[in-house]
Amino acid sequence: MQLNSTEISELIKKRIAQFNVVSEAQSTGTIVSVSDGVIRIHGLADVMQGEMIALPGNRYAIALNLERDSVGAVVMGPYADLAEGMEVKCTGRILEVPVGRGLLGRVVNTLGQPIDGKGEIDNDGFSPIEVIAPGVIDRQSVDQPVQTGYKAVDSMVPIGRGQRELIIGDRQTGKTALAIDAIINQRDSGIKCIYVAIGQKASTISNVVRKLEEHGALQNTIVVVASASESAALQYLAPYAGCAMGEYFRDRGEDALIVYDDLSKQAVAYRQISLLLRRPPGREAYPGDVFYLHSRLLERAARVNADYVERFTNGAVKGQTGSLTALPIIETQAGDVSAFVPTNVISITDGQIFLETSFFNAGIRPAVNPGISVSRVGGSAQTKLVKKLAGGIRTALAQYRELAAFAQFASDLDDATRKQLSHGQKVTELLKQKQFEPMSVAQLGLSLAAAEFGYLDDVEVERVGSFESNLLAYANANYAEFMKDLSKSGDFNDTIKAKLIEILDSFKKNSAW
């Protein structure tokens, strides 16, 4: 067979033309040690801080320690089958979670994967869990209220949209109950809610989800779960994931409320990771950046102005401000608010609601201590009605506590002191409230008016509770339209004052309480 050199060269040219090199540069490394969910990797010269590292078995780790000759990373999920010598790869991606309206009514894990058995989630895209908080120029002052439905909170420590209000207290003082009631009260307010459960028992979380469903609040709530059985990495990242889901609504000119339950457990998870990564421990064995852990999270809760929203949505939403309100929860040990993490979070937030064990055990629930509970910015967000009528409540309670301490030692008291003590007792009784019974603005206003205008003076302390419940039932039955309008407007003027007095007079005359 005669080979023609021209044909051969043509054939070679054709082959060369068809030759296609598809090569992809990948940074790979090798696991050198595995211990308690933390892996050390040799190689990965191009890895970024916080980057996702692909592991065998469709799992990921997050790079946290970038050292001279190795990388320390935390595994997202089970790690028992990882071993030395396994190959890992850089992904070039930062951890992202699904965001959007499709998440409302769903229970998801830290990675945004559904765990409620209701099928796939129809999300609107993905968002990185670590985002820089809006700057000063993009923010607007807090001047709209978030009604929790609790008399003690809405009257004395009001919360505004875009505020960070800490709920702090020992275990079993009603911290979660307060936060869950605040979520339930947003059923008809248009505020979307995110509940982040960190390091809690699965049975407790399922109970919370059931209660939200029973009260019709789950449909506008996202529940993010990193239970006690999850790895420390997932517990540490859960609040950031929940925050990214809340920012979706904030940046589109809507209002959202996020509850972190609780950040003490997140700090403990972060401490565990840091110690395993051999970072130097500081006070209470926490790492040096534990303040930054919480500050970068809570600074993302803000009220953003209309320009920011318009810019973010490329002009699709105009003239609307957005907000993300945060209710972080911190658990104290034996009422010690001067411990490391509590003082950090108190200094970051715009006020705190302090729940006291002695109040709770005495039957004062919610167990809010009005003496050291404050709201630094919420006052400007209070409705006119509550602002005008709640002024005397805090003063009455402060005077009552002071006098009650002295009254223990005094044998005879003058009439003025006796009157103040009696009024203080009645106000304390009035502020008691059962769980899952949030109050409307009008109901709150009417209760406060009864205390402010002296209608409780001739009511015995034991009868204050029944007096109030009968008064509210009477008002809802006979003045339904007025109560509805008042809840909507939250206004206060001479006409409204006269109407409230008319309701109280009429009730006192006609009703057997």
From Swiss-Prot:
It is an enzyme of class 7 (translocase). Belongs to the ATPase alpha/beta chains family. Its main location: membrane. It holds the Pfam family ATP-synt_ab_N. ATP binds at residues 169-176. It is a peripheral membrane protein. GO terms for molecular function: ADP binding; ATP binding; proton-transporting ATP synthase activity, rotational mechanism. The keyword Translocase applies. F-type ATPases have 2 components, CF(1) - the catalytic core - and CF(0) - the membrane proton channel. CF(1) has five subunits: alpha(3), beta(3), gamma(1), delta(1), epsilon(1). CF(0) has three main subunits: a(1), b(2) and c(9-12). The alpha and beta chains form an alternating ring which encloses part of the gamma chain. CF(1) is attached to CF(0) by a central stalk formed by the gamma and epsilon chains, while a peripheral stalk is formed by the delta and b chains. It comes from Glaesserella parasuis serovar 5 (strain SH0165). This is ATP synthase subunit alpha. PANTHER family: ATP SYNTHASE SUBUNIT ALPHA, MITOCHONDRIAL.
